[in-house]
């Protein structure tokens, strides 16, 4: 007899109903719950899966390089990055009629193509790639690395080469390795690449393997390094008239602290970036020697944590016992990693446009919008995941005895104060922000716009002025040429910063007003509400007033009947589920704000944002409706254009999103009737009745239906906005 899915759970495999399929999928990655799972096995499976993920990442990036080299226009694009659209890949679609072939044939390519809005062209150009052969070489190298990663994953599952649990739990060695080897040496290698390849290429000097050892990146070579005359490497930087990619106006400096942007490319100075990575490398290589391993130097993390007690004694035992708790909980470690990664991803979104590192990226408007939105959504999903695994930690891994009196138990002890304060903040933000918006809408509707409540963000303007923004004329610190801070900035550090912050063509410290003040608080409401739901879900995961024994029910349970007052919404999973909706709301408001402000800036029409962003109808009419008009005319009875695919995706995204509500607003009886009706029809229809339905149809559980609904809501939401964003921006700016 064939083994039924899932192999990892004999109990589920023998289930005669469709529950077998859904629960099998739901628990396929929950290794801890699988039959015969040992701690040793668990760690090895996760370790091997890391190599699998690395292989997928390298294969994906290899594919990007390969398709651009094969079907792109990289060599043509670098001759005129501001006017030639970069091609991602060709389109070979048998459904295309002549109008579609003509609409999608662009960028001097003989057939239909997709335009690249990922920024890879700018990235590859900045780091010194110049020909299709360079791209092919990179692609083949990454393919080799992907193969190596797959082999490593397989190898480490073999008994002879599989590490023991003690190896995985050697936190000091792992941290030293990650800090020094992964962060430190990779940063050093990257600064080396920038100094030896990218900076010379930006000055018209072609460096490859054939002349790598003979072409000095600096005229003095390593002599200043060994003599301690390091400042020599910062002398004679590229001039303000430097033409990127040529020797015209080029200097010889390789490590600088200029600040601001290259006047032509509007990106950070490559020599500043190289300096940054070298400094990071030194810091991390030193940091990788902090913890005690085989040698009798450095600290034990356990000792550090146990010593962390407040002298006043008012904070209990502080971090006592945390080492064992964290080191023995994969969920705690994953939660910390996801929280860090979420913050970093959001910072990438912010810095990619405000301090753009890649040449000519900021002039590619659609790519800027796509990269910001992409990274903010990813940050949102990662952050919610951090809290989900925090909740699982409290249910599965938290030991009350081992953590008595320390910071973890104290947080649990006063969770009601934390939750109620967060609740108060969200209520305050919600009522006041919505109140201001609605008041302004009423004033607009009643024909008295002068009665709107418009609040200038004076504190934020003061902070911008302190950093050198001149437009507000507040004359404070860097915005006052008579201050000591101003003098220091000109003589000691970042002389280009003030030009950068006051440059109208970049997005560093944009001018803000009442519309920004309101949307800032709307976003703050979203952030605090999402946090409230996630924090409450994690802190109540073990038990709440209504359900003190909640931890015995696990991470996701459907209902425990009306006896406790109805418990359908209080599992930790439900908190995660609700938080994702709020997260999507928040990222929506954030990206709406970023996009609308920038398209008005880029069009020289900033007054539209300033006037219309102070009331809700302004957002609906002048941002959403106005910018979707071209999109929904991508195809109509008279024909189609190159926005047609985005118009179709806009529709498709709405449909997926709306399908989510069918799963979210329904009772279990509805699903039982629906599934039985579907099976009945399936078994009585020619052709489909050839396939026998062996499992008894059982309705989705409440938790399952919510998951399916949430997935459709999220995917549809992202698809809809992606289509809107790319189409509305590319229609205006290419």
From Swiss-Prot:
Residues annotated for chlorophyll a B3 binding in this entry: 662, 670
Membrane-spanning intervals of the chain: 46-69, 135-158, 175-199, 273-291, 330-353, 369-395, 417-439, 517-535, 575-596, 643-665, 707-727
Binding site for phylloquinone: 671
Membrane topology of this protein: Multi-pass membrane protein
Main location: plastid
Catalytic activity: reduced [plastocyanin] + hnu + oxidized [2Fe-2S]-[ferredoxin] = oxidized [plastocyanin] + reduced [2Fe-2S]-[ferredoxin]
Residues reported in the UniProt entry to bind [4Fe-4S] cluster: 559, 568
Protein residues bound to chlorophyll a B1: 654
Entry note: cofactor: P700 is a chlorophyll a/chlorophyll a' dimer, A0 is one or more chlorophyll a, A1 is one or both phylloquinones and FX is a shared 4Fe-4S iron-sulfur center.
Annotated localization: Plastid, Chloroplast thylakoid membrane
Function, as annotated: PsaA and PsaB bind P700, the primary electron donor of photosystem I (PSI), as well as the electron acceptors A0, A1 and FX. PSI is a plastocyanin/cytochrome c6-ferredoxin oxidoreductase, converting photonic excitation into a charge separation, which transfers an electron from the donor P700 chlorophyll pair to the spectroscopically characterized acceptors A0, A1, FX, FA and FB in turn. Oxidized P700 is reduced on the lumenal side of the thylakoid membrane by plastocyanin or cytochrome c6.
Protein family membership: Belongs to the PsaA/PsaB family.
PANTHER family, per the entry: OUTER MEMBRANE PROTEIN, OMPA-RELATED, PHOTOSYSTEM I P700 CHLOROPHYLL A APOPROTEIN A1-RELATED
Protein name (database record): Photosystem I P700 chlorophyll a apoprotein A2
Highest classification ranks of the organism: Eukaryota, Discoba, Euglenozoa, Euglenida, Spirocuta
């Amino acid at each position: 007899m064939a083994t039924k899915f899932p192999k990892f759970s004999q109990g589920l495999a023998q289930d005669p109903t469709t529950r077998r399929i859904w629960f099998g999928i739901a628990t396929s990655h929950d290794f801890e719950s699988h039959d015969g799972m040992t701690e040793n096995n668990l760690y090895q499976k996760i370790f091997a899966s890391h190599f699998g993920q690395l292989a997928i990442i390298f294969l994906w990036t290899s594919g990007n390089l390969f398709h651009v080299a094969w079907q792109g226009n990289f060599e043509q694009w670098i001759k005129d990055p501001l006017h030639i659209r970069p091609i991602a890949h060709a389109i070979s679609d048998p459904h295309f009629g002549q109008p579609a072939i003509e609409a999608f044939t662009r960028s001097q390519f003989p057939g239909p193509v997709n335009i690249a809005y990922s920024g890879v062209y700018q990235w590859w150009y900045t780091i010194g790639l110049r020909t299709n052969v360079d791209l092919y070489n990179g692609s083949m190298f990454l393919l080799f690395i992907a193969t190596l990663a797959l082999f490593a994953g397989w190898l480490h599952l073999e008994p002879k080469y599989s590490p023991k649990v003690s190896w995985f739990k050697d936190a000091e060695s792992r941290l030293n390795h990650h800090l020094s080897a992964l962060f430190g040496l990779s940063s050093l290698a990257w600064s080396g690449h920038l100094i030896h390849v990218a900076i010379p290429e930006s000055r018209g000097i072609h460096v490859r393997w054939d002349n790598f050892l003979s072409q000095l990146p600096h005229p003095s070579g390593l002599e200043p390094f060994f003599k301690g005359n390091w400042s020599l490497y910062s002398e004679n930087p590229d001039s303000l008239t430097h033409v990127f990619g040529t020797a015209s106006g080029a200097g010889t400096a390789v490590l600088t602290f200029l600040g601001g942007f290259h006047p032509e490319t509007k990106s950070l100075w490559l020599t500043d970036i190289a300096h940054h990575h070298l400094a990071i490398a030194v810091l991390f290589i030193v940091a990788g020697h902090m913890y005690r391993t085989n040698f009798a130097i450095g600290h034990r993390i356990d000792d550090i944590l146990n010593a962390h007690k407040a002298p006043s004694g008012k904070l209990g035992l502080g971090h006592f016992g945390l080492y064992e708790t964290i080191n023995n909980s994969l969920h705690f470690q994953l939660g910390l990693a996801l929280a860090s990664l979420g913050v970093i991803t959001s910072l990438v979104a912010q810095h990619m446009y405000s301090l753009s590192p890649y040449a000519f990226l900021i002039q590619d408007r659609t790519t800027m919008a796509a990269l910001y939105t992409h990274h903010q959504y990813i940050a949102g999903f990662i952050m919610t995941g951090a809290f989900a695994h925090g909740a699982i930690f409290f249910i599965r891994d938290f030991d009350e005895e081992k953590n008595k009196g320390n910071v973890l138990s104290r947080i649990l002890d006063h969770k009601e104060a934390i939750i109620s304060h967060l609740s108060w903040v969200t209520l305050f933000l919600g009522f006041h922000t919505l109140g201001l918006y609605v008041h302004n809408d009423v004033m607009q509707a009643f024909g008295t716009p002068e009665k709107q409540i418009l609040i200038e963000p004076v504190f934020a303007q003061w902070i911008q002025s302190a950093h050198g923004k001149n437009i507000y004329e507040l004359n404070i610190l860097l915005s006052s040429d008579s201050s000591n801070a101003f003098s220091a900035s000109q003589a000691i550090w970042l002389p280009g910063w003030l030009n950068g912050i006051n440059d109208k063509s970049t997005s560093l410290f944009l001018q803000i007003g009442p519309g920004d003040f309101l949307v800032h608080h709307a976003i703050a409401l979203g952030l605090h509400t999402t946090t409230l739901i996630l924090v409450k879900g994690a802190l109540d995961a073990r038990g709440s007033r209504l359900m003190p024994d909640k931890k015995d029910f696990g991470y996701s349970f459907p209902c425990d009947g009306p006896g406790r007052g109805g418990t359908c919404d209080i599992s930790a999973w439900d908190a995660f589920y609700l938080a994702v909706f709020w997260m999507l709301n928040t990222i929506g408001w954030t990206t709406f704000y970023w996009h609308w402000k920038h398209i008005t800036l880029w069009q020289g029409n900033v007054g539209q944002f300033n006037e219309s962003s102070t009331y809700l109808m302004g957002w609906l009419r002048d941002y959403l409706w106005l910018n979707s008009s071209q999109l929904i005319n991508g195809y109509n009875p008279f024909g189609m254009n190159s926005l047609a695919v985005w118009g179709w995706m806009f529709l498709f995204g709405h449909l997926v999103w709306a399908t989510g509500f069918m799963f979210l607003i329904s009772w279990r009886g509805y699903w039982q009737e629906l599934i039985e009706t579907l099976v009945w029809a399936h078994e009585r229809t020619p052709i489909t009745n050839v396939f026998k339905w062996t499992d008894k149809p059982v309705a989705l559980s409440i938790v399952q239906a919510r998951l399916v609904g949430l997935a459709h809501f999220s995917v549809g939401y992202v698809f809809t906005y992606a289509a809107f964003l790319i189409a509305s921006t590319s229609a205006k700016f290419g």
